[in-house]
Swiss-Prot record:
It comes from Drosophila persimilis. Keywords: mRNA processing, mRNA splicing, Nucleus, RNA-binding, RNA-mediated gene silencing. Residues 30-108 form the RRM domain. This is Nuclear cap-binding protein subunit 2. Component of the cap-binding complex (CBC), which binds co-transcriptionally to the 5' cap of pre-mRNAs and is involved in various processes such as pre-mRNA splicing and RNA-mediated gene silencing (RNAi). The CBC complex is involved in miRNA-mediated RNA interference via its interaction with Ars2 and is required for primary microRNAs (miRNAs) processing. Also involved in innate immunity via the short interfering RNAs (siRNAs) processing machinery by restricting the viral RNA production. One of its GO terms (biological process) is siRNA processing. One of its GO terms (cellular component) is nuclear cap binding complex. The keyword Ligase does not apply. Its main location: nucleus.
Length: 154
């Protein structure tokens, strides 16, 4: 099993550049992607947790691209790589708002990446969920649209 600071197999499919450029960016990056957040987790809570590992330079909350409300992820950027490595070691897999959060390397925040990429504006993973998850908006958004009663023909 890989240690926390090694690169995972996940790669952002929207990265602008070659695979080797992406690998290099990830290995030099001070930016982390944080996933599986509750929609109700605040920037202040994230700062409190991640600042235990070093000086946080920037937090960018992930937003629903239509509603501009939190949608369960963020980016955390440190000033130096070693502090980001500490966060990978010690924060990945911990609980925040009663949820196990995932921390992974990110090649660096670029404007526009703070928005969900799903059809309904949030994260793709929340669109098809069949279980109820109160911390992430209930049932999957596309499932909710399919089972919503049709009131047009009444």
């Amino acid at each position: 099993m890989a240690t926390s600071v090694e690169l995972s197999s996940y790669r952002d499919q929207h990265f602008k550049g070659s695979r080797s450029e992406q690998e290099r960016s990830l290995k030099d990056s001070c930016t982390l992607y944080v996933g599986n957040l509750s929609f109700y987790t605040t920037e202040e809570q994230i700062h409190e947790l991640f600042s235990r590992c070093g000086d946080v330079r920037l937090i960018v909350m992930g937003l629903d691209k239509y509603k501009k409300t939190p949608c369960g992820f963020c980016f955390v950027e440190y000033y130096i790589r070693s502090e980001a490595e500490s966060a990978m070691r010690f924060v990945n897999g911990t609980r925040l708002d009663d949820r196990l959060i995932r921390v992974d390397w990110d090649a660096g925040f670029i404007e526009g990446r703070q928005y969900g990429r799903g059809k309904t504006g949030g994260q793709v993973r929340d669109e098809y969920r069949t279980d109820y998850d109160a911390g992430r908006g209930g049932y999957g958004k596309l499932l909710s649209l399919k089972i919503a009663p049709n009131t047009d023909n009444r």
